[in-house]
Amino acid sequence: MTAQLIDGKAIAQTIRSTLKQKVAARIEAGKRAPGLAVILVGLDAASKIYVGSKRRACEEVGFESRSFDLDINTSEADLLALIDKCNQDPSIDGILVQLPLPEHIDDSKVIERIRPDKDVDGFHPYNVGRLAQRIPVLRPCTPLGIMTLIKSTGVDTYGLDATIVGASNIVGRPMTLELLLAGCTTTTCHRFTKNLEQKVRQADLLVVAVGKPGFILGEWIKPGAIVIDVGINRLENGSLVGDVEFDAASQHAGFITPVPGGVGPMTIACLLENTLYAAETYHDVN
């Protein structure tokens, strides 16, 4: 068996093309373009690349992109003040603060300062709580993108045994909630999990997000499983690999995401979807 590739890059481009059409229709109807504020603190190389991708994506679909590049020594108080300013700006529908932040700034305090109706990353406790209560509005971007990738396979998720490896607030925990919503029986694995191999082997659907290259052996994959590899790791030779042994896993899985070109493009596409959703649901003047 050789797995079918789930082409996140192509699916994300389709989403972006649809968004571009919707934005053009908004403007033709006399409405403004959605606005996204992107805040970067410091000069972390990986974050700069990722933020740059988000800004270019905004411009591609016709959004207004507002960029705030702050010095790494920016105080927490100054960052919170900037968020307050963006919260009050009616031309801004979404606020994104690129994580991780410098150690002297409290991530949780920053996330909670963003108004829930402008929290297009979907990290605010209000939005996570809505997802937990099965009434989601703005949903965490990476899990939302993963759900779109899973749907593209045509596989019915109801009743699937799903295993999530990694329990971060950004991916693992909200991913568990999304898969529960999708009718899966879910197992979430973390640093204290025993018998990880056994839990992976039983998974009809596997999502891995730990940031360790080749952490999941290909031979563990259940025949025909859907494998979603969220990890993106740069090796010493400069190549990018995921958290799953791709070549070996491809011999067992039914569907698998590549790295790069799988989950990453979907995260940005869903950020744009959330921003348009916020504009239409919360901020349009009727």
Swiss-Prot record:
Enzyme Commission no: 1.5.1.5, 3.5.4.9
SUPFAM superfamilies the record matches: Aminoacid dehydrogenase-like, N-terminal domain (SSF53223), NAD(P)-binding Rossmann-fold domains (SSF51735)
Domain of life: Bacteria
Pfam families linked: THF_DHG_CYH, THF_DHG_CYH_C
Residue sites binding NADP(+) per the record: G166, A167, S168, I232
Pathway the protein acts in: One-carbon metabolism; tetrahydrofolate interconversion
CDD domains according to UniProt: NAD_bind_m-THF_DH_Cyclohyd
Any single biological process term in GO: purine nucleotide biosynthetic process
Intrachain disulfide bonds: none
Gene3D superfamilies the record matches: Leucine Dehydrogenase, chain A, domain 1, NAD(P)-binding Rossmann-like Domain
The reaction(s) this protein catalyses: (6R)-5,10-methylene-5,6,7,8-tetrahydrofolate + NADP(+) = (6R)-5,10-methenyltetrahydrofolate + NADPH; (6R)-5,10-methenyltetrahydrofolate + H2O = (6R)-10-formyltetrahydrofolate + H(+)
Biological function: Catalyzes the oxidation of 5,10-methylenetetrahydrofolate to 5,10-methenyltetrahydrofolate and then the hydrolysis of 5,10-methenyltetrahydrofolate to 10-formyltetrahydrofolate.
Assembly and binders: Homodimer.
NCBIfam families, alphabetized: PRK10792.1 (NF008058)
Designated name of the protein: Bifunctional protein FolD
Species the sequence originates in: Shewanella denitrificans (strain OS217 / ATCC BAA-1090 / DSM 15013)
